[in-house]
C-alpha cells in the first residue's frame, strides 16, 4: 500500500490528539499538516496545546515543532495533504460548510463530527457493517462538483457497542425491536475527572442529542443506496436512554432485543464468534482480528478490565440471557475514544485507501 499524506483538522482537541497518537506509527498514513482555530494558528503544536495534552502517552516528538495552520484557510491545508481527518468543535452548520469546503478543494474528508451523518449522499460507515455504502461517493462528488473530494463519516460513539452485536443476527433471525440503555464515559464529552468534577459520585441522566442519534443512525447504517442517496432502513424499531456515568473511558450498553425468528442462545453465540467483515477480510492495519468477544463470566465486560481488548477496537459482550418482555438481553462495551472516535475514523480511512478513493 502506498503512503498518503494526512492532515488533522481540529488537532488541538481531545479527538485531534487521539488522531495524532494513532497516526504516529501508521504504516500507510504520514501526518504532514495540523490545523486548528485561528488562535492556535502560527504557533508550534507544543505551544498551541500547552498543558492541555490529554493522552496517557507523551506528545509525539514529531509533532511538537510542527506549526499549526488555520483550519479556515482550506486551500493552504489541502495543498499539503492527500486527505484530512476532521474533529472540530464548532456549530453544526459551520462544520458542514467547513467539510464541504475541503471536499470542494479536492481534499477528501474523513469526519469524526456528527454534522454530515444524516446527509443522504454522505456515507456513514462502520467498516464491518456497511462498507458497501462507500459506493455513494460518485453521486456525492457529482453534487459537489468534485473529481476527488468527498466526505465520509463515522457513526456516533454510543452505537459502537450494540449495533455490531445486533448486525450479524439480522440476516438469519430478523431483529424487530430493540431497547438500549447506554452508560457513557466522560471522555465522550471531551472531559477528564479533573475537568468534570460534577460527575464524581454522580450520574447525569441526559446527554443532549444522544438518544436521537442512538435511535436514528443505526437505521442509516442498515439502509441501502437508491440512486443518489442512502435510504435508511425502516426496521428494527429502536428506543434509547443515554446516561453519563463516572467512568473515564468506555461506553456500555444494556440491550433488550426481539427477533422475527427467535434464535437459541447457542446460535447467537456462534453467530457472534464467527462474525467478521471487510475490515478483517482485507486485514486493515487498525482492524481487530476478532471483532466481537463474548465473556462467560457474570460480571463482565467491565470498562476497567476490557475496554482495551484488541487495542480498543473490538466490542465486548456478556450476560446474554432470555428475557420475559423481549426475547433476549445482554450487555456490551466499546471504547468510545478509540473504536467510537479516532480509531473508527482511521479504520474507515484504511478502507477508503484500499478501495482507491484517495487516488
Regions found by a protein language model. Give the residues of each.
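N-terminal Rossmann-like NAD(P) cofactor-binding subdomain of oxidoreductases
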Residues: 1-206, 236-237, 309, 315-316, ...
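Charged docking surfaces used in two-component/phosphorelay signaling
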Residues: 187-359
Amino acid at each position: 500500500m502506498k503512503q498518503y499524506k494526512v492532515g488533522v483538522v481540529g488537532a488541538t482537541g481531545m479527538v485531534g490528539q487521539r488522531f495524532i497518537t494513532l497516526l504516529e506509527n501508521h504504516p500507510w498514513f504520514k501526518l504532514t499538516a495540523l490545523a486548528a482555530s485561528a488562535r492556535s494558528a502560527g504557533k508550534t503544536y507544543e505551544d498551541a496545546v500547552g498543558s492541555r495534552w490529554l493522552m496517557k502517552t507523551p506528545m509525539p516528538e514529531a509533532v511538537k515543532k510542527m506549526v499549526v495552520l488555520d483550519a479556515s484557510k482550506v486551500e493552504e491545508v489541502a495543498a499539503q495533504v492527500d486527505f484530512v481527518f476532521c474533529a472540530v468543535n464548532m456549530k453544526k452548520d459551520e462544520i458542514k460548510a467547513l467539510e464541504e469546503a475541503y471536499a470542494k478543494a479536492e481534499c477528501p474528508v474523513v469526519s469524526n463530527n456528527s454534522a454530515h451523518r444524516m446527509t443522504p449522499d454522505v456515507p456513514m460507515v462502520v467498516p464491518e457493517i456497511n462498507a458497501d455504502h462507500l459506493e455513494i461517493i460518485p453521486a456525492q462528488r457529482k453534487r459537489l462538483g468534485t473529481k476527488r473530494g468527498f466526505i465520509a463519516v463515522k457513526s456516533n460513539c454510543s452505537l459502537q457497542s450494540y449495533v455490531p452485536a445486533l448486525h450479524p443476527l439480522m440476516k438469519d433471525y430478523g431483529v424487530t425491536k430493540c431497547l438500549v440503555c447506554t452508560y457513557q464515559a466522560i471522555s465522550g464529552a471531551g472531559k477528564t475527572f479533573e475537568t468534570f468534577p460534577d460527575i464524581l459520585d454522580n450520574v447525569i441522566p441526559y446527554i443532549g442529542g444522544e438518544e436521537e442519534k442512538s435511535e436514528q443512525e443505526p437505521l442509516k447504517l442498515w439502509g441501502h443506496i437508491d440512486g443518489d442517496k442512502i435510504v435508511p432502513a425502516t426496521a428494527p424499531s429502536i428506543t434509547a436512554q443515554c446516561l453519563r456515568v463516572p467512568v473515564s473511558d468506555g461506553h456500555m450498553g444494556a440491550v433488550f432485543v426481539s427477533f422475527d425468528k427467535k434464535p437459541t442462545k447457542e446460535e447467537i453465540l456462534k453467530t457472534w464468534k464467527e462474525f467478521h467483515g471487510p475490515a478483517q477480510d482485507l486485514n486493515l492495519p487498525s482492524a481487530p482480528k476478532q471483532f466481537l468477544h463474548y465473556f462467560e463470566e457474570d460480571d463482565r465486560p467491565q470498562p476497567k478490565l476490557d475496554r482495551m481488548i484488541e487495542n480498543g477496537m473490538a466490542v465486548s459482550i456478556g450476560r446474554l440471557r432470555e428475557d420475559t418482555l423481549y426475547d433476549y438481553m445482554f450487555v456490551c462495551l466499546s471504547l468510545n475514544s478509540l473504536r467510537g472516535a479516532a480509531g473508527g475514523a482511521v479504520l474507515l480511512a484504511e478502507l477508503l485507501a484500499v478501495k482507491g478513493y484517495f487516488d
